[in-house]
Design a protein with these regions (language model features):
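Short acidic, S/G/P-rich loop/turn micro-motifs used as interaction or catalytic elements
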Residues: 96-97, 129-131, 163-164, 304-307
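Canonical P-loop GTPase G-domain recognition
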Residues: 143, 147-157, 161-223
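Non-catalytic alpha-helical coupling and interface elements of nucleotide-dependent molecular machines
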Residues: 32, 85, 109-113, 126, ...
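P-loop NTP-binding site
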Residues: 1-8, 13-14, 18, 203-345
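A short acidic, often aromatic-flanked loop/helix-cap motif at beta-alpha or helix-coil junctions
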Residues: 65-68, 189-194, 334-339
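Short, aromatic/basic amphipathic alpha-helical patches
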Residues: 48-55, 169-175, 312-318
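A structural preference for short, hydrophobic beta-strand core positions in alpha/beta folds
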Residues: 36, 183-186, 327-329
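Nucleotide-state-sensitive switch-loop elements of NTP-binding domains
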Residues: 2-9, 14, 18-146
Length: 345
């Protein structure tokens, strides 16, 4: 049987990585072999670390979105398939990426031919971010990207329903915007609804057939409105349970699209994130084995401010911790204009 490629899109902070980790675990319980391809505009991705810590084979496409780095994405997908013979390839594009159907799904279906089944394109939605977009609370060009992501979805996944007081309201908004998309209520954190989604998309006909018009000038402006930062920091001698919330609260910037941090100390692994519409840091344990006096922290920040200002804020927050923070690598930038390798209308 040929492997199935299941690409899961969605805006920054919507819960894509949590969903992929949960889906991989559920598929493994079914006896399926799973691999994951992650994606970011620069190396040093928290998402890749989370997937690898879950014991799932993974490859990272860094430096550009799947559409602009199509050859790298296709090559790494082929390598994972050759090495692990998976039943399912899960892939997560950059959270600000759009036009996936025309620039990734259809070109890949042509290139792979009968050697790969391309599942319906699923897009994850955080109800809080959806409300922010509907209220006009984010940059108009960035909101343009958000709405296009919804329009090109074959399947919409209304996530975080376990924390949503009235999921019927965002569900009605999605149905009005995207009446032709299948809609599932899920919680990537608890797993509610995920099995049903997997059953549906893995048994469905190939996806990626939706055609949308994209103004690439507005698309580029929407991405450039965000400062992006990836950093790796070594710390010593801290109360690790409190470090990530303190660090994130010290990055005192408005306009957070997604701020995600991962801390590893010995066998202790913590991850925390703050997203559009949910500013308070949410901390969870990925592993709870004994920690040591040393820790490594990965910081991924996507915030609506100039890259230099973002870098200064993060470096200042690290210094405020008072834990001898040694920055091992840091890069702050705004994404360059997207130039897809292919575009099949």
């Amino acid at each position: 049987m040929i492997p199935t490629l299941l690409i899961v899109g969605g805006f920054l902070g919507s819960g894509k990585t949590t969903l992929l980790a949960k889906a991989a675990a559920m598929l493994a319980k079914r006896g399926k072999r799973v691999v994951v391809v992650t994606n970011d505009q620069a190396p040093g991705l928290v998402d890749t670390a989370i997937i690898e810590l879950a014991g799932v084979p993974a490859a990272e496409v860094a430096g550009a979105c799947f559409c602009c780095a199509f050859d790298d994405f296709a090559a790494k997908t082929r390598q994972l398939i050759a090495r692990h013979q998976p039943d399912v390839v899960l892939a997560e594009p950059v959270g600000s990426c759009v036009d996936i159907a025309a620039t990734v799904l259809r070109p890949l279906a042509v290139e792979a031919g009968s050697t790969l089944h391309v599942a319906p394109f699923s897009v994850v939605v955080d109800p809080a971010a959806l409300r922010e977009v509907e209220a006009g609370a984010i940059d108009p060009a960035t909101a343009y990207i958000y709405r296009l992501q919804l329009r090109e979805a074959d399947v919409l996944l209304l996530n975080k329903c376990d924390a949503e007081p009235d999921p019927a309201l965002p569900e009605a908004i999605l149905s009005a915007h995207c009446p032709s998309a299948a809609l599932f209520r899920i919680s990537a954190a608890t797993g509610d609804g995920v099995e049903g989604w997997l059953d549906a998309v893995l048994a469905a006909a190939p996806g990626g057939g939706k055609r949308i018009e994209v103004d690439y000038d507005t698309y580029a402006a929407g991405e450039a409105a965000l400062g992006w930062l990836n950093a790796t920091v070594d710390l010593h001698g801290g109360d690790w349970e409190s470090v990530l919330p303190r660090l994130m609260q010290s990055i005192d910037l408005r306009g957070i699209a997604h701020l995600k941090c991962l801390l590893k100390s010995g066998g202790l692994v913590l991850v925390a994130n703050s997203v559009t519409g949910r500013p308070e840091p949410h901390l969870r344990r990925l592993a709870s084995v004994a920690s040591t006096l040393d820790a490594r922290v990965i910081v991924n920040a996507r915030i609506a401010c100039p890259p230099d200002e973002l870098r200064q804020a993060v470096e200042g927050a690290i210094a405020t911790l008072g834990l001898g923070g040694q920055v091992k690598g840091i890069r702050a930038f705004s994404p360059s204009r997207p130039v897809p390798r292919h575009r099949l209308g």
